[in-house]
């Protein structure tokens, strides 16, 4: 019995053990399966982790963009709110500051009314200047300081009444009293000055330069010096004695009780250097000023008056312009600097009074100039220089001693003077033709001298080809005039320019560079040929005065110039009333 129970217990135990073995085998199999499947799971987890990290990065970037967008939107809202507030503000007005008071208030002129208002703490009351523009808020209080007015009407200053008031002349000779703004506090005012005023406030703000005078004068000192003028050494010495000596040695003139000359007249045929000398005088004076004052750069003023532009159809305007010109000269001379007032073509505006050869406007213009020149007597450093090729037409009262004291005739150049003038334009540094250089041993100086000598001989030779005019005098005498009798510095310069142009054209055609003697010879011929017709249809008397031929009255003129082959016959010149071109 016991053994059966033992067997049953043993069988049960075996079954139990078998079941445990089966479970263990299943567990081992499960573990084996799980062990086999574990690499695939780890890869999947890694992939899921990477995807999660990418999603996190995208969300972070999106979050940053949203934050920036929100900030930008917030800034735009703030700016729009400020813009709305600014547009909703009432308009600001402007006024003119008149003065301040001890209690901190100020007077302003606005809208045609004079008001006493307060000033914003942001504005320094002490910095406000009389006549200055200020900004006003809605309550008409000063909130900002502006600049001075820059537009208005132009009037003429007549008289200074006291420290801050002036009497001015407006349109139609209307007189008005205005206040002077602080912008004019340090500006010296002279009678005739143009002032800018604001008519509503009654303030004068600025002195306006006289444009009408600026158009008539040229203040720049020319760069022409005496070294650039040829053939006029005697005339240059005369004008230097007349102008430079009184300025450089005033004590010697005072010691000898010698009054410096007030003016100089340069007269002579056209193109002989009158204007050139006047320019050189101003340049030389500037250098002398530098030597006297010890300054590196001297200063002188050259008022070149454009004579015909002085004339005006309105009565009294020309005289007023002359007064303004001399007023300018006095202003410049008051600083101790020499001033030259140069009237070119003086006969065009200061003709003899009562001559009947013009509209007789000179009946008032000449006396105005005379009074101005006499007014220069008590004023130092002002010199009047006139230039004319018709000195016989200038009013004698201008030419008398005490006005234009020194009269210098600028003659036509003779052969020696022509060499000097040629040397100013033909220099060794010019391109010279190799053949011409070879003829003179390669010396550039010798070649240039030979060119000048050939040109002068060609111009001044009394040969058949150089005959120009035959003049008949009132007494029946006849005289043959050659081209040399009509030579001038301007003609010499023109001849040299023609020769240089020929040299350039030859270089472009042949490739050989350089100026040649034959270029100068051809230029002389072309210049003479070009002047053949210049004296036609000219009244002989007028022509003689212009050309510098004085003496017996000329009644008949005949041209003698011949063609290149010498076959062209001479022509007579008609004597008619109308004037034409002058040589």
UniProtKB/Swiss-Prot annotation:
Residues 2-90 form a coiled coil. Keywords: ATP-binding, Chaperone, Coiled coil, Nucleotide-binding, Proteasome. SMART domains: AAA. InterPro entries: AAA+_ATPase, AAA_ATPase_domain, ATPase_AAA_core, ATPase_AAA_CS, NA-bd_OB-fold, P-loop_NTPase, Prot_ATP_ID_OB_2nd, Prot_ATP_ID_OB_N. GO terms for biological process: modification-dependent protein catabolic process; proteasomal protein catabolic process. One of its GO terms (cellular component) is proteasome complex. Consists of three main regions, an N-terminal coiled-coil domain that binds to protein Pup and functions as a docking station, an interdomain involved in ARC hexamerization, and a C-terminal ATPase domain of the AAA type. This is Proteasome-associated ATPase.
């Amino acid at each position: 019995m016991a053994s059966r129970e033992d067997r049953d217990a043993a069988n049960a135990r075996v079954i139990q053990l078998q079941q445990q073995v089966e479970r263990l085998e299943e567990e081992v199999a499960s573990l084996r399966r799980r062990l086999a499947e574990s690499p695939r799971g780890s890869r999947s987890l890694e992939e899921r982790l990477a995807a999660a990290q990418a999603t996190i990065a995208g969300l972070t970037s999106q979050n940053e963009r949203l934050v920036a967008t929100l900030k930008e939107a917030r800034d735009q809202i703030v700016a729009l709110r400020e813009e709305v507030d600014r547009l909703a503000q009432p308009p600001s007005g402007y006024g003119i500051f008149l003065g301040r008071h001890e209690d901190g208030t100020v007077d302003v002129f606005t809208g045609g009314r004079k008001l006493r208002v307060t000033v914003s703490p942001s504005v320094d009351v002490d910095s406000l200047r009389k006549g200055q523009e200020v900004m006003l808020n809605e309550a008409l209080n000063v909130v900002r300081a502006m600049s001075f007015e820059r537009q208005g009407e132009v009037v003429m200053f007549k008289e200074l009444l006291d420290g801050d008031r002036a009497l001015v002349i407006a349109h139609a000779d209307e007189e008005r009293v205005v206040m002077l703004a602080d912008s004019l506090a340090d500006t010296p005012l002279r009678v005739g000055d143009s002032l800018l005023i604001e008519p509503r406030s009654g303030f004068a703000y600025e002195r306006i330069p006289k444009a009408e005078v600026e158009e008539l004068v040229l203040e720049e000192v020319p760069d022409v010096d005496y070294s650039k003028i040829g053939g006029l050494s005697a005339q240059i010495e005369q004008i230097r004695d007349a102008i430079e000596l009184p300025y450089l040695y005033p004590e010697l003139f005072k010691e000898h009780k010698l009054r410096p000359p007030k003016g100089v007249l340069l007269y002579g045929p056209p193109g002989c250097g009158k204007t050139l000398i006047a320019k050189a005088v101003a340049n030389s004076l500037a250098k002398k000023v530098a030597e006297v004052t010890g300054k590196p750069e001297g200063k002188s003023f050259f008022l070149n008056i454009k004579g015909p532009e002085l004339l005006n159809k309105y009565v009294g305007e020309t005289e007023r312009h002359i007064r303004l010109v001399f007023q300018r000269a006095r202003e410049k001379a008051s600083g101790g600097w020499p001033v030259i007032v140069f009237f070119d073509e003086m006969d065009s505006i200061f003709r003899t009074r009562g001559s009947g050869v013009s509209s007789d406007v000179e009946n008032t213009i000449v006396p105005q100039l005379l009074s101005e020149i006499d007014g220069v007597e008590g004023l130092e450093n002002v010199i009047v220089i006139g230039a004319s090729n018709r000195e016989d037409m200038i009013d004698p009262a201008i030419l008398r001693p005490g006005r234009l004291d020194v009269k210098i005739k600028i003659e036509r150049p003779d052969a020696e003077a022509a060499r000097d003038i040629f040397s100013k334009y033909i220099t060794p540094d010019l391109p010279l033709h190799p053949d011409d250089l070879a003829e003179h041993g390669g010396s550039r100086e010798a070649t240039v001298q030979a060119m000048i000598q050939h040109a002068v001989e060609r111009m001044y030779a009394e040969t058949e080809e150089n005959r120009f005019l035959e003049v008949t005098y009132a007494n029946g005498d006849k005289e043959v005039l050659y081209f040399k009798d009509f030579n001038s510095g301007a003609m010499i310069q023109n001849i040299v320019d023609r020769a240089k142009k020929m040299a350039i054209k030859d270089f472009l055609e042949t490739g050989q560079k350089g100026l040649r003697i034959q270029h100068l010879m051809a230029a002389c011929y072309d210049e003479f040929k070009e002047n053949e017709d210049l004296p036609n249809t000219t009244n002989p008397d007028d022509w003689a005065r212009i050309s510098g031929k004085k003496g017996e009255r000329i009644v008949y003129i005949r041209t003698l110039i011949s063609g290149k082959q010498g076959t062209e016959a001479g022509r007579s010149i008609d004597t008619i009333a109308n004037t034409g071109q002058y040589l």
